[in-house]
Amino acid sequence: MSKVQEVIDIVKQMTVLELSELVKALEEEFGVSAAAPVAVAAAPAAGAVAEAVEEQYEFDVILTSSGEKKINVIKVVREITGLGLKEAKTLVDECPNPVKEKITKEEANEIKAKIEEAGGSVEVK
């Protein structure tokens, strides 16, 4: 039987308390920490997940308020969406409503600028 197998057999017979003492003794003897590699390995993975969540490729433009210049906002909404007068008026009257969904950031910012210029309030999500 090899030395490695002998150590494994001894470890199998130890209690949890004895194993804990063994780990502490090994850490002191060799100047290492059993917890360090796990923490170091987990940190970059968590950071990568957070970065992936933060990146967004599709945006929704939500009209939150028509402001005082409702007619101008209706005109801009019609231009952007291609809706008829009645549908655009309903969309503007019943805020908050999505004007356009699943669009690029650039397009969302252009639409936001147009609606705000007309007097409305917009939120990009």
Curated annotation (Swiss-Prot):
GO terms for molecular function: mRNA binding; structural constituent of ribosome. Gene3D superfamilies: 3.30.1390.10, Single helix bin. The keyword Electron transport does not apply. Keywords: Ribonucleoprotein, Ribosomal protein. GO terms for biological process: translation. It comes from the Bacteria. InterPro entries: Ribosomal_bL12, Ribosomal_bL12_C, Ribosomal_bL12_C/ClpS-like, Ribosomal_bL12_oligo, Ribosomal_bL12_oligo_N_sf. One of its GO terms (cellular component) is cytosolic large ribosomal subunit. Signal peptide: none annotated. It holds the Pfam family Ribosomal_L12_N. CDD domains: Ribosomal_L7_L12. Belongs to the bacterial ribosomal protein bL12 family. PANTHER family: 39S RIBOSOMAL PROTEIN L12 (PTHR45987), LARGE RIBOSOMAL SUBUNIT PROTEIN BL12M (PTHR45987:SF4). Forms part of the ribosomal stalk which helps the ribosome interact with GTP-bound translation factors. Is thus essential for accurate translation. NCBIfam families: L12. Homodimer. Part of the ribosomal stalk of the 50S ribosomal subunit. Forms a multimeric L10(L12)X complex, where L10 forms an elongated spine to which 2 to 4 L12 dimers bind in a sequential fashion. Binds GTP-bound translation factors. This is Large ribosomal subunit protein bL12.
